[in-house]
Regions:
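N-terminal, Lys/Arg- and Ser/Thr-rich interaction peptides
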Residues: 1-10
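Extended interfacial segments that mediate partner engagement and assembly in macromolecular machines
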Residues: 9-115, 127, 131-133, 146-147
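Extracellular/lumenal ectodomain signal focusing on beta-strand-rich modules
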Residues: 43, 56, 124, 170, ...
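Short, acidic/hydrophobic/Gly-rich beta-strand patch recurrent on exposed beta strands
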Residues: 72-75, 139-141, 274
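Mid-to-C-terminal catalytic/tRNA-binding core of tRNA(Ile)-lysidine synthase
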Residues: 121-123, 324
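Short, aliphatic-rich beta-strand segments
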Residues: 127, 134-143, 205-209, 309
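Rossmann-like S-adenosyl-L-methionine
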Residues: 148-384
Length: 384
């Protein structure tokens, strides 16, 4: 497919000009080059329709002609905003919602924030959609603590969304006064609805707040988590550790097949969401702790605690030697490694295989079509 933004230095889809089959072939070959020496690499799991998969959109506001504002994304390696009407990666409903936000903001005569001058009101708009439920969240990020005429904005937004045939479930104002590239600030105010939306994934329902970490490609996330839980070979008797657990998605997916799930996550907001998600789904065999994964597992190993299976889904920088050594001391029968960076996964596997684990195999999952990124599920078994 052709994209008008690509000619304007968007940079969001570096592989868009490459046939999708060729993209998959390259990603599979890259994973094999990095991980093949540890175990077999299965064929990559691609998407049937590799477009409009992103259920989360972040747009930046910018000045437009006639004293109005527009919204879009930064051009590659710049702070120049490219106006976006539609995007081949973004959920098509969210494209329309963003146009409704823009129209409502212009109707209220809001001005975009100017980075250099520090003037203006609107910085960003974050949109989320629960693809299974159809619910939509609008988060308006402002440079000032008060949104003038907030009720009028909500009324205008709902009317503009209705014109375009799209829903708006909740509207949240987020106040971010800092000079930073971080999108969200600390303070929030619910302007409409409950301040969260629901989505269903792998048979569980999740409440998503503005800050919730949630995979942006729901189709491939279901594939990824299904592969991870299958790789654990759970029988219902196992104690499972879900490290770097986020809002608990992998652990809760596995909870029906495990005796007990223990989740560990450093982000306290995510842990609060995980506890709420367990309660909402009636899961009584899962506990979640707010702690650094390395510090927590080291302490658990020192205390002689054991786990039958460890799920680990670390950030792009991978895990730490201390974490991996503590895993080996806990001696789980299986380790299921979910990686968003095969390079750091290969580094971590070098240590795990020295500590008595053997890789049974790896399955690449194309979570982000038209980008260079690839996720991998790896299964390791204890051999000594």
């Amino acid at each position: 497919m052709d994209c008008k933004l690509r000619a304007k230095n968007c940079g969001g889809c570096p592989m868009l000009a490459t046939e999708y089959a060729a993209q998959l072939k390259k990603k599979e070959a890259d994973v094999h080059a990095l991980l093949g020496k540890y175990g077999p690499v299965a064929p990559i799991r691609g998407m049937e329709t590799p477009y409009h998969y992103r259920n989360k959109v972040i747009s930046t506001f910018a000045p437009a002609a006639g004293g109005k504002l527009t919204s879009g994304i930064y051009a590659a390696r710049t702070h120049k905003v490219l106006p976006v009407e539609s995007c081949l990666l973004q959920d098509e409903v969210l494209d329309k919602v963003m146009l409704a936000v823009r129209a409502a903001a212009n109707a209220c005569r809001y001005q975009p924030f100017h980075e250099d001058k520090g003037t203006g009101l609107l910085r960003h708009c974050l949109l989320r959609r629960g693809v299974a439920t159809g619910q939509v969240m609008v988060v308006l990020v402002t440079a000032q603590p008060v949104l003038p005429g907030a009720k009028n904005f909500v009324k205008a937004l709902l009317a503009e969304a209705e014109k375009r045939g799209v829903p708006v479930t909740t509207v949240v104002q987020n106040y971010n006064p800092r000079r930073t590239s971080v999108v969200l600030g600390e303070d929030e105010k619910v302007l409409y609805g409950k301040g969260f939306i629901l989505d269903t994934l792998c048979g569980k329902t999740y409440a998503l707040s503005p800050r919730s970490f949630y995979q942006v490609n729901p189709v491939q996330t279901a594939v990824l988590y299904g592969l991870a839980v299958d790789a654990a070979h759970l029988t219902g008797k196992e104690v499972v550790l879900d490290a770097y657990c986020g809002i608990g998605t992998i652990g809760l997916t596995a909870s029906d097949k495990a005796r007990q799930v223990v989740g560990v996550e450093v982000n306290r907001d995510a842990v609060r969401d995980a506890i709420g998600n367990a309660k909402h789904n009636g899961v009584k065999n899962a506990r979640f702790f707010a702690a650094d994964a390395t510090a927590w597992i080291r302490e658990a190993a020192d205390a002689g605690q054991k786990a039958d299976v460890v799920f680990m889904d670390p950030p792009r920088e991978g895990s730490t030697p201390a974490f991996l050594e503590s895993v080996a001391r806990m001696a789980p029968k299986r380790v299921v490694y979910v990686s968003c960076n095969p390079e750091t996964m290969a580094r971590d596997l070098a240590l795990l295989t020295q500590k008595g684990y053997r890789a049974e195999g790896f399955t690449p999952v194309d979570m982000f079509p038209h980008s260079a990124h690839c996720e991998v599920v790896g299964s390791l078994v204890r051999v000594k």
